[in-house]
Amino acid sequence: MVLNYTMHMMYSKNWKAKKGLIRVTLDLDGNRIKDIHISGDFFMFPEDSINRLEDMLRGSSIEKINDIIRDFYNQGVITPGVEPEDFIQALRVI
């Protein structure tokens, strides 16, 4: 009998960007993002983009976060005072 255990962890992090606070709650199953919620006091245009970012991250491995964030910003998303690196830092797991 072989038992296969994966580590299930919840993380919550606040990251202060130049012009806003990013709040992230991550539900990880091993190194995969099972669920994610991003909120904060920053502006993002188009306004529904945050949902798209969460959808892009959900199900991906944490090693792919940098690439996903950069791809997301390459789609024309604008976040005044908040840089792609701010989201990468907010999503960085200890």
Curated annotation (Swiss-Prot):
One Pfam match: Lip_prot_lig_C
SUPFAM superfamilies the record matches: SufE/NifU (SSF82649)
Any one GO molecular function term: lipoate-protein ligase activity
Keyword Acetylation carried by entry: no
Recorded GO CC terms: protein-containing complex
Pathway given in the UniProt record: Protein modification; protein lipoylation via exogenous pathway; protein N(6)-(lipoyl)lysine from lipoate: step 1/2; Protein modification; protein lipoylation via exogenous pathway; protein N(6)-(lipoyl)lysine from lipoate: step 2/2
Enzyme Commission code(s) on record: 6.3.1.20
GO terms classed as biological process: protein lipoylation
Keywords: ATP-binding, Ligase, Nucleotide-binding
EC class name: ligase
Catalytic activity: L-lysyl-[lipoyl-carrier protein] + (R)-lipoate + ATP = N(6)-[(R)-lipoyl]-L-lysyl-[lipoyl-carrier protein] + AMP + diphosphate + H(+)
Role of this protein: Part of a lipoate-protein ligase complex that catalyzes both the ATP-dependent activation of exogenously supplied lipoate to lipoyl-AMP and the transfer of the activated lipoyl onto the lipoyl domains of lipoate-dependent enzymes. Can also use octanoate as substrate.
Other facts noted in the record for this chain: In contrast to E.coli, where the lipoate-protein ligase is encoded by a single gene product (LplA) with a large N-terminal domain and a small C-terminal domain, the same activity in T.acidophilum is dependent on two separate proteins, corresponding to the two domains of E.coli LplA, respectively.
Assembly mode: Heterodimer composed of LplA and LplB.
The protein's name: Lipoate-protein ligase A subunit 2
Organism: Thermoplasma acidophilum (strain ATCC 25905 / DSM 1728 / JCM 9062 / NBRC 15155 / AMRC-C165)
